[in-house]
UniProtKB/Swiss-Prot annotation:
Part of the 30S ribosomal subunit. Forms a tight heterodimer with protein bS6. This is Small ribosomal subunit protein bS18. Binds as a heterodimer with protein bS6 to the central domain of the 16S rRNA, where it helps stabilize the platform of the 30S subunit. Keywords: Ribonucleoprotein, Ribosomal protein, RNA-binding, rRNA-binding.
């Protein structure tokens, strides 16, 4: 039967604690700008919330409030349907 070594916590590599402590506070760009409704025709703004592979970036990463995230999802999907934005990264923007 195989024997297992006990893991020694002292030999683990140390993490850089400064990079873990300093995280930029996320804020909602639409709240700051006073936007009431996100427009699907504003392609430049919508591109900021789409990843390189074409996926919509979640609110926990962008800091967007829930009401604006729902509007953003709808606007991106409309822009994709009207061929203003690509569905995937295989297409040129």
């Amino acid at each position: 039967m195989a024997t297992f070594k006990k893991f020694n916590k002292d030999k683990r590599p140390k993490r850089n604690t400064q990079s873990l402590l300093f995280k930029r506070k996320r804020f909602c760009r639409f709240t700051v700008a006073g936007v009431e409704e996100i427009d699907y025709k504003d392609v430049d703004t919508l591109r900021d919330f789409i990843a390189e592979n074409g996926k919509i970036i979640p609110a926990r990463l962008t800091g967007t409030r829930a009401i604006y995230q729902r509007q953003l999802n709808t606007a991106i999907k409309r822009a994709r349907f009207l061929a203003l934005l690509p569905y995937s990264d295989q297409h040129k923007i």
